[in-house]
């Protein structure tokens, strides 16, 4: 599997704060940016507004980040880190359907925490070629992770052997990002309904209709 994109490799970030109060301020800036990016988008959110939402002076922002763009990179890096920590290893005796539902729910819960960053990134990359290139790398990485999951599930009893696994991984990854984008206008019940629908769709793309009771070893 390809390595996770390193969005900060060329960034000159201020050092990680050592004092607890400074770490708390950095966290407040991140939370404020996520909220404002979600509410107003990237261009309509200013550094001054981020600092104000965090109840901090504008100068404090520059002690932690050199620009709004750098903060966006940090937030997306945080999202990728959280995504990389999602384990695909199933517990013994769990059904593939249950595993899929649990994985999708955990992944979606993680992604929703960074919805503001995702929406800001999608906007910013329209006028920032480097962010657009980074987005291609992100998508290649997330598609590879989906492919790894499908490869694992394909080994389970009852799995179909006649489907094209790579194109299916790309379709599922595209579906996941699309659901995240649309979730901003959904209620919690609607989000769970979409997760259930995605689980059903993916499961029946991989497993025969008679495989429902099979368990992973």
Q: Which residues does each PLM region occupy?
A:
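Amphipathic alpha-helical packing segments from all-alpha helical-bundle domains
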Residues: 81-84, 109-113, 129-155, 166-170, ...
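Generic hydrophobic, amphipathic alpha-helix propensity
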Residues: 22-34, 50-51, 71, 75-83, ...
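N-terminal intrinsically disordered/low-complexity leader segments
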Residues: 1-24, 210-217
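Solvent-exposed, amphipathic alpha-helical segments
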Residues: 28, 32-40, 82-90, 171-182
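Hydrophobic alpha-helical connector segments
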Residues: 74, 88-116, 165-172, 195
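Short, hydrophobic secondary-structure boundary micro-motifs
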Residues: 118-121, 133-134, 162, 188, ...
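Helix-turn-helix
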Residues: 28, 36-70, 74
